[in-house]
């Protein structure tokens, strides 16, 4: 049921990803102008990711009706399939952000969605079905939800679950999101809808990220007061300056509880680029650039934390083991599950972007 109040009025807040999770949602990829070769390689990768997460917690996958049978064949029998229409398969951004209160009750938020920029720089023209997905998911899992009065995607925000929110100016202040709102007004809306006390604004996201710099591709919150940050030591890499800007902001701030923020540098893979074969397998589109030789916005920070497990993208044989080692040292109590996920990267994101956790 759609509510007319706000989370702040009702005492609900945004919990951290590393807190207990009851289920994880994905959507089944099919767009031929985003996923190569009729989306078949992407479907294989999505299925592998969903099946591995299903060994840890309940998994639900939204699928359009014409792909139901194929998805059912590829997914484990304990993965629930639900027919929900959508325009593309980025559940982090089109699904609900689910809040909790002190009594353990849950409520969702249906953000307004405009395909990462609307008429200004959106990636496709028709996002009407995407904009309804969050409400549908809330109805299916049986929770009430708020309809937020502004545009936001789940990949644009990270939290420590203790009052601190991390985001980027590049995304939230983009003219394609909420040009009618000032930065101060956006802060106020985030506090009202997410129950947070402090917002840490990083200047930019990852280089060439077509979401206008989602924070979940740049960094991840792995514990209260502790983050991993995508990093390169190559001065010729455009990301070199961007990561240092982000680190300087993080070093200069304290979180909502007054803690200094511990930063773990997580090296970037690559740089990685579209191959000619990969680019040629994607249908032409006016909104999405998929050209041979174009740099991919690749990051190991785009992982998912679920109940003591980290589902980590594997992207480059030269750096995969380094990323695993750094994360395992930073998160010794977690089991890291490494999953080759280049096919998700080719579509413009990675494991965190295609999943949305529901708090327990």
Curated annotation (Swiss-Prot):
Keyword Nucleotidyltransferase set for record: no
EC number from the UniProt entry: 3.5.3.12
Active-site positions on this chain: 353
Reaction(s) this enzyme catalyzes, per UniProt: agmatine + H2O = N-carbamoylputrescine + NH4(+)
Signal peptide positions on this chain: none
Keywords: Hydrolase
Any one GO molecular-function label of the UniProt entry: protein-arginine deiminase activity
Broad enzyme group: hydrolase
Stored InterPro entries: Agmatine_deiminase (IPR017754), Peptidyl-Arg-deiminase_porph (IPR007466)
A GO biological-process term: putrescine biosynthetic process
Similarity comment: Belongs to the agmatine deiminase family.
PANTHER family: AGMATINE DEIMINASE-RELATED
Name listed for the protein in its UniProt record: Putative agmatine deiminase
Source organism per UniProt: Vibrio parahaemolyticus serotype O3:K6 (strain RIMD 2210633)
């Amino acid at each position: 049921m759609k509510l007319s109040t706000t989370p702040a009025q009702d005492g609900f807040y945004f919990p951290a990803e590393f807190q207990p999770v009851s289920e994880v949602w994905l959507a089944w990829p099919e767009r031929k102008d985003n996923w190569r070769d009729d989306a078949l390689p992407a479907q294989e990768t999505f299925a592998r990711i969903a099946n591995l997460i299903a060994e840890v917690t309940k998994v639900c996958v939204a699928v359009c009706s014409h792909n139901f049978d194929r998805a059912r064949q590829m997914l484990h029998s304990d993965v629930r399939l639900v027919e929900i229409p959508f325009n593309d398969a980025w559940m982090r951004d089109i699904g609900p952000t689910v809040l909790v209160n002190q009594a353990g009750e849950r409520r969702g938020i249906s953000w307004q969605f405009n395909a990462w920029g609307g008429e200004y720089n959106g990636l496709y023209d028709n996002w009407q079905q995407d904009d309804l997905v969050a409400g549908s998911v809330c109805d299916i899992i049986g929770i009430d939800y708020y309809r937020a009065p502004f545009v936001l995607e789940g990949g644009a925000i990270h939290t420590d679950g203790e009052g601190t929110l991390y985001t980027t100016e590049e995304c939230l202040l983009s003219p394609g999101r909420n040009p009618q709102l000032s930065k101060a007004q956006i802060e106020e809306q985030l506090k009202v809808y997410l129950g947070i006390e402090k917002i840490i604004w990083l200047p930019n996201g990852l280089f060439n990220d077509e979401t206008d710099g989602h924070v979940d591709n740049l960094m991840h919150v792995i514990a209260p007061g502790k983050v991993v940050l995508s990093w390169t030591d190559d001065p010729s890499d455009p990301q070199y300056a961007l990561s240092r800007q982000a680190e300087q902001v993080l070093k200069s701030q304290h979180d909502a509880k007054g803690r200094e923020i511990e930063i773990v540098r997580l090296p970037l893979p690559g740089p990685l680029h579209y191959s000619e074969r990969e680019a040629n397998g994607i249908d032409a589109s006016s909104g999405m650039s998929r050209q041979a030789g174009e740099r991919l916005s690749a990051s190991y920070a785009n992982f998912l934390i679920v109940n003591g497990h980290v589902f980590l993208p594997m992207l480059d044989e030269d750096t995969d083991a380094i990323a695993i080692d750094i994360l395992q040292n930073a998160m010794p109590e977690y089991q890291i599950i490494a999953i080759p996920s280049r096919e998700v990267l080719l579509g413009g994101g990675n494991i965190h972007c295609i999943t949305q956790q529901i708090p327990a």
